[in-house]
Regions:
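Solvent-exposed residues in well-ordered beta-strands and their adjoining turns
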Residues: 44, 87, 161, 199-203, ...
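Phosphate/pyrophosphate- and phosphate-bearing ligand-binding catalytic cores of soluble enzymes
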Residues: 19-21, 27-33, 72, 168-274
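Anion-binding (especially nucleotide phosphate/pyrophosphate-binding) glycine-rich loop
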Residues: 7-156, 162-164
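Serine residues within intrinsically disordered or low-complexity segments
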Residues: 3-4
Length: 276
């Protein structure tokens, strides 16, 4: 954090968390917009998260938790509360058995960096998530996906801080209610849980055969390819569509495909023909 800002500390038991005041939120959004946060802190652990929420609750201050800020557009007036940035790290292989590898990942890990790491060691299951901006915690919140893969397909469980009970809980995949770009954390109980970490299960060996025309065109007629090859193809396509948020402010692709009831399909098709 910027040491030039005035600061104080949140204290809970023997835990001491540094709090910054009047932090420019443009530095915490890939859109590079927004005013100041009245309070700002970075959480490196579950204890940090608990400390921050306890401090805020004692003072009646709202808390907004973020990852890398790729799914938020701040108001020009800023945020009149505590912005808590989740930077919890960790990448631990828990088990390897019968071609399946379970990995626990900290919520603050950058998603693309984790995907790169898993493909380097020959694992498959997340390579199509390459270059999606944000953290692994955010990917659970959003059920990030693309080119035939979603976080829900590899997720085993989520460790989270429950802001109501003030306890750390473990939620199995089914309890997360992951859907198309949706989850329990985003849609049903927004703000209740802070994702601390997640456990995923990946596979060894070649990547699954893709059916996406753009990827097939890049990969040729290979029936099987490595996860690294598929990652490279996905990156090439994404780079052709969107600029790097570090160079040009943007938040990636945030549009979702419409979900239609069966009776509405023919109407949609007739309307689409008008534009062909």
């Amino acid at each position: 954090m910027d040491s030039s800002n005035s600061h104080s500390y949140a204290v809970k038991g023997d835990k001491r968390l540094q709090l910054e005041q009047d932090v420019d939120l443009r530095d915490h959004s890939t859109m590079r917009v927004g005013g100041p946060a009245k309070w700002f802190a970075e959480a490196n652990s579950a204890a940090d998260v608990e400390c921050a929420y306890a401090w805020a609750a004692e003072r009646g201050i709202p808390v907004y938790t973020i990852g890398s800020g790729s799914n938020v557009i701040w108001s020009d007036t800023g945020y009149a509360g505590l912005v808590l940035k989740n930077i919890i790290r960790g990448f631990q292989i828990l088990s390897e058995q019968d071609g399946q590898v379970a990995i626990r990942i900290g919520a603050g890990e950058i998603l693309d960096e984790v995907v790169a790491r898993t493909t380097r060691i020959g694992l498959t299951g997340m390579e199509c998530l390459s270059l999606i901006p944000g953290t692994c915690g955010g990917s659970v919140y959003q059920n990030s996906g693309g080119y035939g893969q979603e976080v829900s397909q590899v997720l085993q469980s989520v460790d989270a801080f429950d802001t109501i009970s003030c306890k750390v809980v473990v939620l199995e995949t089914e309890a997360c209610n992951l859907g198309y770009r949706s989850s329990r954390f985003k849609n049903e109980e927004p703000g209740r849980y802070v994702v601390l970490g997640l456990t995923v299960k990946l596979q060894t060996g070649p990547a699954n055969r893709t059916t996406y025309p753009a990827l097939l065109a890049m990969l040729g007629d290979r029936s099987r390819c490595s996860s690294a090859d598929l990652r490279a193809a996905v990156i090439s396509i994404r780079e052709s569509k969107l600029p790097d948020p570090a160079l040009v402010p943007n938040c990636g692709s945030f549009f979702t495909n419409p979900i239609l009831r069966a009776r509405d399909v023919n109407v949609a098709l007739r309307l689409s023909l008008i534009h062909i």
